[in-house]
Amino acid sequence: MATEEDVRRVCLSLPRVTERLSWGQPAWFAKTLMARMWEDGVLTVKTTERDVLAGSEPETYFWTPHHDRSPSLVLVRLDRVADDELRELLEESHRLASRR
């Protein structure tokens, strides 16, 4: 089970990541936004696998109508994701956010 502190630790261990508020929530930026707390216990990350993740584990990965126009964003329930999986998600999100 991951926590917001785990997210912070992993994000800030990645190259050139900064933390600041976005829409009143903690967020982490590479060149662009790479991760943001959506609400308590739910994290937004960038991925190329949104449909696969949500299709295989909908209790962990999902999106809302707000995210329909952003197919690279997925929401993650932190209490359902293992630490190693969280790290993989954040590393991919970092790569995607660093490309711009």
Predicted regions and their residues:
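Charge-dense, helix-prone N-terminal extensions
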Residues: 1-100
